[in-house]
Amino acid sequence: MPQWNIIQAVNDALRVEMKRDDRVVLLGEDIGKFGGVFRATAGLYEEFGETRVIDTPLAEGGIIGAAIGMALYGLRPVPEIQFSDFIYPAFDQIVNELGKIRYRSGGQYPAPVVIRTPVGGGIKGGHYHSQSPEALFIHAGGLQVVCPSNPVDAKGLLASAIRGQDPVLFLEPKRVYRAAKGEVPEGEYTIPIGEAKVVREGKGMTVLAYGAMLHEAEAACAETPDLDAELIDLRTLWPLDIEAVTRSVRKTGRCAIVHEAPRSCGFGAEIAALVQERCFYHLEAPILRIAGWDTPFPYTLENDYLPLAPRIQKGLLELRERRP
């Protein structure tokens, strides 16, 4: 199997699914002749042509609106929003149209639109190129939200998203776009949406993470093996695999949640609520959230803002000593 990074895995997934199903169409800013700002669509314009790899104006609302129309007419569009920070001009189209079409039509019109967008920090992009808006779209309802941490999951989950009948927000973590590498199956390959993965087994505490922060949490756990932490890669944020989370927390009695979005009203708050509802009598300590600060994403202080391995390690050591 080839050794690929996440960008290469995404590119291959798109190529395989476009060959498999001629209804799959790509659209977005600079995705065609240029191959995308991160080169995730490189070569696809030459292979499939301008009618299936479509360069669009810089108008996010228009990109998503066009994708919705394509889906209603039987296509399977995969629009790219160049950075997740720029997804907000399309908020109305995503939340009020895309996420509600199946409900509004009484199930007559599914909208299989997969929105790809790079997410999070890691490139010193400041507050215009580093945000993590997953909680907003999970809250909106009607959308599946996926955030892989590695190339294998990126390919398998993207293929499943494209083949599904639901709208999906597919978040690609920039910090590990090229840094995370692994052997990726060639040809058709899928991973079911909605299934978390136990990355590291343990009995001392449960650590939940996704995207780029999975790697930081993994490093923190490896540096402190006596914590005996069980690390879970959520992979799919919504629908959340709450059963896998529940099983782990009931076993360990302690839970830490790691994400790079701001702490207040971040997705970790919802996970914490679900965990305490299901595991209250099994908890030996309050649930811990290790997250970005409640500030705009800084440029110079990026590494102080992100919950990197040293801060995670410090938090986990404190969690071990916590009592109800």
What is each PLM-predicted segment?
Residues 1-167, 171, 176, 303, ...:
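Thiamine diphosphate
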